[in-house]
């Protein structure tokens, strides 16, 4: 039976396979089959753990912050692999592996409480698609962040085209996630939008990326400014995901999850 006690085994194996894939990618001047194979294997290992944890908990592992970090690492591996296959950047797997590993290590050092309870509001048809679509969009935009940082410090203006494609895809999924969330909110709480702190930061993040898209389509802005905008938009995304939970104003948010067993059921919230 796969449970959270087994996570260190799957995490170590996944990260090891991803690192091997990154090394093969860096050592090859063309797209490496070994890099693709090792990366896919790492993704599959983490996917098996997620599926096993889902079976063990008898609920989708999407409720706690630790569980969303797990999905982020999984989707980050996929996003990095797709970027490598499409644009053949040898270094992208190294950075996507690093970003995935950071969240894996956080989960190893600060595991959440993973029980089987699921508050009534989370027992909704919108729960799984809303959270998974959001986490996939975060991962795609994470790759755009990697491209932006590399383009900024290596003075590679041509990377903007790749960043554009990643932002288009990421914002599309982000918008779908927001739409699904609003439908879920209407069903659970009677309002499509309540402007609580996390929702406010979601709009800030969304607007940051929309400004980037509009500047690329209609503006005459230098590549350095555009890369900086992408970096700050990604930082806003991190604030929306977990940073806002540390703000005093967020304590009454309908999205806040307090992962303590003794907390009463009405105060439990989803992390997205």
Residue positions per predicted region:
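Short, hydrophobic transmembrane alpha-helix segments
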Residues: 24-31, 56-59
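Membrane-interface helix-loop-helix modules in multi-pass inner-membrane proteins
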Residues: 45-99, 109, 182-203
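Glycine/small-residue-rich hydrophobic helix-like segments
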Residues: 174-224
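Single conserved hydrophobic/aromatic residue that forms the stacking wall/gate
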Residues: 261-272
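Membrane-embedded alpha-helical transmembrane segments of multi-pass integral membrane proteins
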Residues: 17-24, 41-52, 73-80, 99-106, ...
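Membrane-interfacial loop-to-transmembrane alpha-helix junctions, especially the N-terminal start
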Residues: 30-42, 90-97, 159-170, 223-230
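C-terminal ends of transmembrane alpha-helices
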Residues: 44-55, 101-129, 151, 171-189, ...
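Hydrophobic transmembrane alpha-helical segments in integral membrane proteins
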Residues: 1-19, 129-141
